[in-house]
Structure formats: structure tokens, C-alpha cells
Amino acid sequence: MAREFEDHCWRDIIDDDLVEIYKSYERDLHVGERPAILAIDLYKNAYIGGDKPVIEANREHAGSCGENAWKALPPTQKLLAAARAAGVPVIYTTRHVDTRGVNSTNRDSRKLRTDAYDIVDEVKPQDGELIIYKERASAFFGTPLIAHLNRMGVRSIVALGE
């Protein structure tokens, strides 16, 4: 896996240390039968503050991925377009927010912008694409995602996003 990073569109946002760390996981990769794209947390809160260095963006806006999020947009758009053209389902995840402050974490959601967890326009879902609203970090825990994957006959997931 690590040796193949050199040829991938994300190479410019993955630093050498991370490539080295993941060398021990190297193996042949492939997309299995009946795949789906799982677009994880491409919401506005990850992009807020613009393409500043991540630490700086996150200091100003908790949860911002700064320049990493913005650099990932073009390859993400390319992958989504290719998947759609091939008829591969695209499924999005985002956080469910109760603006009254009631949620499964200790975060005070009343301080959030009301659109903080809307998917950014640059990669927004197209008509008919599924959006899974989650309360925790996992797209699977406490959500109907697995039921949707089974109903759709999906047997392989290509994950992207935050």
C-alpha cells in the first residue's frame, strides 16, 4: 500500500512520516465486487476558516481540517464523478445536530452554526444519494448504514473524507 502512494492523487497531502508508519500494512489492494463510495463528513465545519494550516484553522474553528480539507477537494470531486459515471452508489455521512444541545456527546451543539454539518457545495449529494446522519464518530454505530448497504447489495466500500 505505501509504495502505491507515490502514484495516487492524495500523495501531496500525505506526508512521508505517515507513509512510513503505514508500510507495515502494505498488501495488494483492490475494490471488491458491488462497491459503494462512503463519503465521510464532508461537512462545512471541516472546511470553515479556509485553506489555512490545519493547526491555525483548528485554533480559530474547532473541527476545521484547514488546508488538508481544501487540498482534498479536487481528487474527491474526481472520484465522485467517476463513481457516478460508473453507476457506483455514493453514500454520505454527516453529524446529526440537535440545536437544543441534546446529543450523545458532551459537546454543546447550541454554539454551532446551524449549517455546520451540511455537506459543502463542492461535493454535495446529488438527487437520490443517501445521507446517513450520525451522532457519534462511527457511521455504523446507531445508524441504519449497514441495513442500507445490505439492501443495496453493496459488498465493498471505498471510504473518503474526514
Descriptions of predicted regions:
Residues M1-Q126:
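Active-site acidic carboxylates
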Residues T93, L160-E162:
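Structural motif
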